[in-house]
Each structure stands twice: as structure tokens, then as C-alpha cells.
Design a protein with these regions (language model features):
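Sec-dependent bacterial lipoprotein signal peptides
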Residues: 1-21
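Subset-of-secretome marker
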Residues: 3, 23-274
Length: 274
């Protein structure tokens, strides 16, 4: 059975980049002055991307997808019709400077599917409940995160800059709704109208059978940005598609630049011969 782990990770990278475009990165400033212009919030956030070293995330997905839109991936699992994604979650930590991450995901409605993915020291370790109880080892995946070299370029920042230019050129509009609380902290609430043409372009860029012929009909994006640091706090994306289905994705980012420990699994937890 083939599970498109790398495609999912690439999509996660695009989603995170879109979130940063909409609501910013770390400014490295303990207390930022009040900002009322949503475009300025976006600009200030994007310029602080290089200061982000580590971050924790919690994600949740609800809604349903049409199995036919997944191409061979859905057929390989023996599924058909709509698949409800309620209670699907993912959480983890990124150590950007070390190109390391640890992600745990769960999809209870699909045979209690769970996955644990660790990338550290140039290798990726993947454990999927439907496949086995041990990790498989492979070369590290290519994600838009920086290397540990002192003079390395923050790849995610380049992705953000490119997406920001695309958003501006396509007529995306940001509106400051007000202030909310996220993780017990004040946060700016910004809505961004993202043209569906741009969303479909990014989906198509993922490649593969699952992306072929997929069209998003409407999308709403809400972002929250921590007032004190201009770090992205929360993303909520709602997408509707006649071909794919209806999805709501919520992403919460916390624990910026706090120490994280990401380690490879013990040899006894890795498939023999790898």
C-alpha cells in the first residue's frame, strides 16, 4: 500500500507558507507597537521570518472529501464515496535551524489511522498504523526549512516572499476584523480574500494524480497574529469544491523559539535492515 507521505508534507509546507503570508512570522521584538493596517501587519510579520528558530503547531481538519478526487490513493485503500474527516488532528514541533521536525497525526474515522513522522540528522523516520508498528527510515524529505549552517538562507522566507508577490498581483485583500484571544494572548484577527485562481495554482503545483483536475470553488481565510510579537497565532481556512468536498483546516502556532528535543527513534523501533 502506498501512502503519499511526502506529498502531504509538501502540502503542509505550502499551507504554512500561506499562513505566514497572511499573518506573519517572528519579529524578534518582545512588545510591538499597535498596528491598525492589516497590510502592515502582513509586511512586518513577513520580514521577521528569519528570527524563527522553533515553533509548535496544533492542527485540526473537519468536513468531508470525495474519494474519487484522490485518484489512485483512494482506490488503493478500497474506499469510495465521501469520507468524513472530522476529528482528524496533527501536532508537532519544527526546529527550523536544524532542519528537524516531529509530527504526529491521527484520522480516527479511517480505520483509526495514525502516523508518526520524525526528521532529524538528514533522515526521515515514518510509522503508519496501517503498515506496521515500526518506523521506516529514508533520506530526509525536501521541505522549505533552513539548514543549520550559520549563513544558510531561510528557504521558507523565500517561499513566503514569492507567495506574497503572487497574492499582491492576484488582488488578494486583507481586512483587520479586530482583536481576539489565542492561547491566552491578545491577537490581531485578519481576514484575507484569496483569489481561487491562486489557490488552484498552488494545488496544481503539488503535482500527482490527486491534484490533477481538482478545482477549489470558494475559500475563506482567517488569520490571527499575536499582538506582542507579531508571530502568527492561528489560521482557519474553509474551502468548498464540487470535485473535492468541503474542508475546514485550523492551525494554531505556539511556543516560538522555545527549546525542543527531536531525536531519532531507537534502533529497536526501526524496521530491520534500514
Amino acid at each position: 500500500m502506498h501512502i503519499p507521505t511526502r506529498s502531504a508534507l509538501r502540502f503542509s509546507g505550502v499551507l504554512l507558507a500561506l499562513a505566514v503570508v497572511g499573518c506573519g512570522g517572528s519579529s524578534g521584538t518582545p512588545t510591538a507597537p499597535p498596528v491598525t493596517d492589516p497590510n502592515q501587519i502582513i509586511a512586518l510579520s513577513a520580514t521577521g521570518m528569519a528570527a524563527v528558530q522553533t515553533v509548535h503547531f496544533e492542527a485540526a481538519v473537519s468536513g468531508s472529501v470525495n474519494i474519487g478526487a484522490l485518484g489512485s490513493s483512494g482506490s488503493a485503500l478500497g474506499l469510495s464515496g465521501p469520507l468524513k474527516l472530522d476529528s482528524t488532528t496533527a501536532s508537532g514541533d519544527f526546529d527550523i535551524q536544524k532542519r528537524a521536525f516531529h509530527i504526529a497525526a491521527s484520522m480516527p474515522v479511517l480505520l483509526s489511522l495514525s502516523a508518526d513522522i520524525i526528521q532529524v540528522d538528514g533522515f526521515q523516520y515514518t510509522k503508519i498504523s496501517l503498515v506496521g508498528t515500526k518506523y521506516t527510515k529514508s533520506s530526509a524529505s525536501t521541505l522549505p526549512i533552513a539548514s543549520a549552517a550559520p549563513n544558510a538562507t531561510l528557504d521558507l522566507a523565500s517561499t513566503v516572499t514569492s507567495l506574497q508577490s503572487s497574492l499582491t498581483a492576484s488582488g488578494a485583500k486583507a481586512t483587520l476584523v479586530g482583536h481576539d484571544q489565542v492561547d491566552g494572548r491578545d491577537a490581531y484577527h485578519v481576514t484575507v480574500s484569496v483569489p481561487t485562481d491562486l489557490i488552484n495554482q498552488e494545488v496544481g503545483a503539488l503535482g500527482g494524480a490527486a491534484a490533477s483536475g481538482v478545482a477549489i470553488d470558494s475559500v475563506t481565510v482567517d488569520y490571527w497574529v499575536y499582538v506582542d510579537s507579531l508571530n502568527p497565532a492561528k489560521l482557519e481556512l474553509k474551502a468548498n469544491s464540487a470535485t473535492v468536498g468541503n474542508l475546514t483546516v485550523t492551525l494554531i502556532l505556539t511556543r516560538y523559539n522555545q527549546p525542543v528535543s527531536i531525536k531519532a527513534p531507537a534502533d529497536s523501533e526501526i524496521e530491520a535492515g534500514q
